[in-house]
Amino acid sequence: MHSESDDNTAGGTPGSEDPQAEESSSPAEEFEEQERKLAPEDSTVQLIHTGCTDKRPATPPGAHPGQGFVPPEGGFGWVVVFAATWCNGSIFGIQNSFGILHMMLVKHHEKQPDQASQFKVAWVGALAMGMIFFCSPVVSMFTDHFGCRKTAVCGAFVAFIGLLTSSFATTLGLWYFTYGILFGCGSSFAFQPSLVILGHYFRQRLGLANGVVTAGSSLFSMGLPVLLKKVVEPLGLPRTFQILSIFMLVQALLALAFKPLLPSGMCPMPGMALDGGPSTPESASRWQKGLAKIRRYFNVRVFSILTYRIWAFGVATAVLGYFVPYVHLLNFVKEQFGDTQREWLLLVCIGASSGVGRLLFGKIGDLIPGVKKIYMQVASFILLGVMSMMIPQCAVFEGLVVVFVLMGLCDGCFITIMAPIAFELVGPMQASQAIGYLLGLMAIPMTAGPPIAGLLHDHFGNYHVAFYLAGVPPIVGGIVMFFVPLVHQRMQKRRKETDDPSMDKMLKNCSNGDMLPGYTDMETHI
């Protein structure tokens, strides 16, 4: 029966008006003819031909889900959570305790009186914090190419070398390189994979996982000030750096647990590379392949998403004054209240409240759908700015405790919800690039904040103006970020209005067998 049909088809003359010849033409040929007639609506025909509806969760433009990948939501993921907790805690515990290191560095240079010493010493900690974020776009490329495990292990080892060599430095110039550059860059390569790897093991409970990681790391922010003030400081600055380097050596070992579940070679969609760009044919020239590889690792596709651009700009604006209290707090307390011997308690308070905030807001973030999570960051940044302005108004030490408890809660909310928002805006396949570019945009303002505050202190003789001005950027950034969910909602409404109104009619015709001549109703449906 098939051979007869084939013979008739082969013997038929194109353009023949013999009805018997028309009946003997194969269904495939008639379908191809019909498809050519419907060329302007080619994508719709392909949808009907597959006979199935797309039931994948909606993703932002340019974001691809990765062939229905479902994270395990636990299991070995909790080991990864522990390793990520140590990573976040050791890095940001050291950074948040830099106020004590700052005082030790200033004391080390007291024999060389310099009116701008606060400005120069502040650059040591600011460089380290800035490099963590400045290197993030490069870290994204390394993470995509080499994976989370190799990137994090190498980064932690570089940070270990930076802290160890800092113990032998004797000048600010050397500390700029060993602590600011080496430790900062190594921390960046160790830190960012710890954010990305959580998305490989959690999705529904990603906010909780981030909350556990960041809350556990707050224990370091609480314990390290006590360790530095009561135990390490009497040993001197060199021993301090040597002891801190042990934390990063342990991190290099724990990072071996960062086993990715989304391999770099997996393509999320047919014909697409991992980053969402078009795949390069085998016959392409060497130049084209080179350009394709460059486009992959310097992928700026995330910036085509308007909501991501607004969010990234708002966060980068807000962090200009974010790190100022951590660096200059202890010197401010010493000038405002004298030698109270209790100033280190403020770092413990901000670490403890930040841990509570990360657990609390991590769970709350899982309950808030979609991009509306950004409203949590909006509130935290605005309150953070107001609290920064309140610091000079505190006439008693207990007032500072209240202010820094609230600032810790805001810090916990901002840190915990950052990765889930990135996943919501760009999807899991581009989350690494999105986080990397965001942290890179944060680098310059976060680095510039503490030295500017030190310069204002040297000019005015106190920290009042510095803390007042440090509160302005978080408020402005929060206002900018407020519009992200509104823009997202407007874009969704516009996409619904521009949907093809004839789709329902075409599906109805298809169900009657009209769309595919030569096929039965059941065959058309299949």
Swiss-Prot record:
Cytoplasmic face of the membrane: 1-73, 143-156, 200-207, 264-309, 365-377, 420-434, 488-526
Catalysed reaction equations from the record: 3,3',5-triiodo-L-thyronine(out) = 3,3',5-triiodo-L-thyronine(in); L-thyroxine(out) = L-thyroxine(in); 3,3',5'-triiodo-L-thyronine(out) = 3,3',5'-triiodo-L-thyronine(in); 3,3'-diiodo-L-thyronine(out) = 3,3'-diiodo-L-thyronine(in)
Keyword Transmembrane: yes
GO MF term set: thyroid hormone binding; thyroid hormone transmembrane transporter activity
Keyword Hydrolase among UniProt keywords: no
Annotated membrane topology: Multi-pass membrane protein
Biased composition (Low complexity): 16-28
CC terms in the record's Gene Ontology section: apical plasma membrane; plasma membrane
Record keywords, A-Z: Cell membrane, Membrane, Transmembrane, Transmembrane helix, Transport
InterPro entries attached to this UniProt entry: MFS, MFS_dom, MFS_trans_sf, Proton-linked_MCT
UniProt topological domain (Extracellular) ranges: 95-121, 178, 229-242, 331-343, 456-466
UniProt note: phenotype after gene disruption: Morpholino knockdown of the protein alters the neural development in embryos.
Segments for region (Disordered): 1-44
One Pfam short name: MFS_1
Annotated localization: Cell membrane
UniProt signal peptide: none
Gene Ontology biological process terms from the UniProt entry: brain development; central nervous system development; chordate embryonic development; locomotion; neuron differentiation; oligodendrocyte differentiation; optomotor response; regulation of thyroid hormone generation
Predominant subcellular localization, coarse grouping: membrane
Entry similarity comment: Belongs to the major facilitator superfamily. Monocarboxylate porter (TC 2.A.1.13) family.
Function description: Specific thyroid hormone transmembrane transporter, that mediates both uptake and efflux of thyroid hormones across the cell membrane independently of pH or a Na(+) gradient. The substrate preference is 3,3-diiodothyronine (3,3'-T2) and T3 and to a lesser extentd T4 and rT3. Acts as a crucial regulator during embryonic development.
Subunit structure: Monomer. Homodimer. Homooligomer.
Protein name: Monocarboxylate transporter 8
